[in-house]
A protein has these predicted regions:
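Transmembrane-embedded, aromatic-rich helix segments that form part
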Residues: 202, 216-234
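Transmembrane alpha-helices and membrane-interface helical segments
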Residues: 137, 184-191, 225-230, 258, ...
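Short hydrophobic alpha-helices at membrane interfaces in multi-pass membrane enzymes
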Residues: 191-209
């Protein structure tokens, strides 16, 4: 209390102030973001890379959302649902590829849902995410955690070459797992070269085996490891060949293990080739080989590496598209590619090895298999615009670009001379950085443009709607409904796939045994149906010519001595394949009648009562003769000759939207 009688605060000791400050700091510690900011600042490159990968996955998920299964996809899925899980199934080659990994994944997936595009896309994107993380991990090990590694990571993430491949599920499940295995094998192999630890060699061998399980191009991964080891993992001497010889000697254990894996795979491949529809053979035209090689480089790989091809040529139906770069941009792209290569070699003489690494992969992994298996059967011009062939080269391109422009992290031992960093050299470095940034921006813009252009000319909606309608039709149709079997649209599955292009496979596998499929309708079939081009189930009708109408008072066409002559209102089409007969069989038991036409006679089973019968014929007819073969009398009311088609004016399952 003061002398005036007023209360005054008690003096606070320094200890109490410190205690108060500590308590306040603890109370507001949750709001202190300094440590978080420091962490992000320290790990900004990794954070930026993760953000890039997340954006890429979202972008590619949106890309996949407008596509659907096509061609090989349906074949692989239907093969999986029909096959037991055994060695014969997983080593089945088919169209020329030993794809054990895909067979296993497809077998498991179809037992969850046969045509589940969402699930299939999720599997593909999971591999994409894993491959991108593997690329980030490898780039950090090779070049350190520096902002520059975001450039090859960006190229790998957005390269349009990979998008058509990703959009076809069977191709994606070959290429993307191979890319993951390649990146992981390179990382483990480099660790082994540097440390000589057995666990790294074991990891590298496992990833080489994984690559082989998913794609025969995995045979080239050990070759890539050898070129990489001899070219960059040891101090370069006089020749690359000499460096590779030294690498062979120093790491002989690795090469022996890789060779054993390759030999074992080749044995399995050779034993499985009898299930392949195509077999390796020497090309019969050097000109076709040259056309393919030049086309794959100038129309697909080089434009794609620079963000192209900028425009596409869609197949009929729009389920896929080939590269169709503008003529002017082809030559601009080639010029830019040459300039980039020359500049990189001028800056780092060893860079030529990096580009040779990329070209070597393209030649060995992407060109040679096509040259020895596809050149004779398909147009070389078309094959040269097939970007799927070089999709697996994108990770090699990203690695090669990094090796061409930057030293390995282990080589950066000397600190830069600050005096030499001034003046002309500093200005040149700044200008080079600006040019490089501009080129990366152009590639980024071109990649987005190219992918959007691909989306504009392709769509999976027709196939998706077809399968959705067919699924609903099978659920709603009575069990045992007779359905005329025919091929699905070639946009979905081409006739080259044989029986796997038939509706009884593509649609029938949705509910095996639910419908009664008829390849060649014959005999008495009431309520015959057909699937229309939209996947809905329609009643079948004959498109052609009808019999002359009954005269007034008649219920049957004239029958003399069990013989009915059916006159049509003109001649049927030249490719007539069937006759439909509406009849009444006057008997208590089934019987047979013969249907005669100029090209032959068909016996047709009939049933008591009012029914519809079909007989297969060949060629144009103007009349047929129906004759009872005993056991009853037949009354023919009407007939048509022509070919079956879906009657889209009648009832439909499921009902079409109004």
């Amino acid at each position: 209390v003061s002398q005036a009688g007023e209360e005054v605060d008690r003096p606070v000791s320094a200890k109490e102030i410190a205690l108060y400050d500590d308590a306040a700091e603890r109370d507001f510690a949750w709001a202190d973001l300094r440590s978080t900011v420091d962490w992000f600042r320290t790990n900004r490159v990794v954070v930026a890379a993760i953000v890039l990968i997340v954006v890429e996955i979202v972008w590619k998920a949106q890309f996949l959302s407008h596509l659907y299964f096509r061609q090989d996809d349906f074949h692989d899925l239907d093969l999986a649902i029909q096959s037991p899980f055994n060695w014969r199934y997983v080593t089945y080659i088919g169209a020329g590829h030993l794809i054990i990994g895909l067979r296993v994944i497809a077998w498991v997936m179809v037992r969850t849902s046969l045509y589940n595009w969402g699930l299939a896309s999720a599997i593909s994107l999971a591999f994409v995410a894993a491959a991108n993380l593997a690329m980030l991990r490898l780039l950090r090990m090779l070049f350190g955690t520096r902002p520059a590694i975001l450039v090859p990571l960006l190229i790998y993430a957005i390269c349009p070459l990979a998008m058509p491949d990703l959009g076809e599920w069977s191709s994606a499940l070959e290429s993307v797992p191979l890319q993951l295995a390649l990146l992981m094998a390179v990382h483990a192999h480099i660790c082994y070269v540097r440390t000589r630890r057995v666990k790294h060699l074991a990891a590298a061998a496992i990833w080489v085996a994984v690559g082989l399980v998913f794609f025969e191009k995995g045979l080239v991964v050990p070759v890539l490891l050898l070129l990489l080891t001899g070219g960059f993992l040891a101090a370069p001497r006089r020749t690359w060949l000499g460096d590779m010889v030294r690498a062979l000697v120093r790491c002989w254990r690795a090469w022996v293990i890789y060779a054993v894996l390759m030999a074992a795979y080749l044995v399995v491949l050779a034993q499985s080739l009898h299930t392949s529809t195509t077999h390796p053979s020497a090309p019969n035209s050097a000109g076709a080989v040259g056309t393919f090689v030049s086309g794959l480089l100038k129309d697909s790989f080089v434009p794609g590496a620079l963000g192209g091809p900028w425009q596409w040529l869609a197949v009929p139906g729009g389920s896929y598209a080939f590269a169709a770069p503008p003529f002017a941009l082809i030559w601009i792209g080639l010029f830019v590619a040459v300039v980039v290569i020359v500049i990189s070699i001028w800056r780092r003489p060893v860079a030529w090895r990096a580009w040779a690494l990329v070209i070597g992969w393209v030649v060995i992994a992407d060109m040679l298999p096509v040259i020895f298996s596809r050149i004779g059967a398909f147009s070389a011009d078309v094959l040269g615009t097939e970007t799927r062939y070089v999709a697996d080269a994108v990770p090699v391109l990203a690695i090669g670009m990094g090796l061409a422009f930057w030293p390995l992290a282990t080589d950066q031992t000397r600190k830069p001379n600050t005096r030499r960093a001034h003046g002309l050299r500093a200005r040149t470095a700044q200008q080079s950085l600006e040019v490089a940034a501009g080129l990366v921006a152009v590639v980024l813009f071109g990649s987005i443009w190219s992918v959007q252009a691909y989306k504009n000319v392709t769509s999976g909606k027709p196939a998706a709607d077809y399968i959705a309608n067919a699924s609903a039709a099978i659920k709603q149709a009575p069990r045992g409904t007779a359905v005329m079997d025919s091929a699905v649209s070639g946009d979905m599955v081409e006739g080259l796939f044989g029986s796997y292009a038939l509706q009884s496979i593509v649609i029938g596998d949705l509910a095996p045994g639910k419908l009664r499929w008829l390849e060649h309708p014959g005999g008495t079939i009431d309520g015959l149906h057909m699937f229309g081009p939209d996947g809905r189930l329609y009643q079948a009708k004959v498109r052609g010519v009808a019999s002359e109408p009954l005269q007034a008072g008649q219920k049957c066409l004239p029958n003399k001595n069990g013989r009915t002559v059916v006159h049509f209102q003109g001649s049927s089409p030249s490719k007539t394949g069937i006759v439909r007969i509406g009849y009444v069989w006057f008997s208590s038991s089934p019987g047979y009648v013969s249907v005669s036409y100029p090209g032959g006679t068909r016996d047709v089973a009939v049933k008591p009562g009012l029914h519809t019968a079909f007989a297969s014929i060949k060629g144009s007819v103007s009349q047929v003769v129906v004759r009872s073969l005993g056991g009853g009398a037949i009354c023919v009311g009407d007939a048509q000759a022509g070919n079956l088609e879906a009657d889209q004016t009648g009832p439909v399952i499921p009902a079409a939207p109004s």
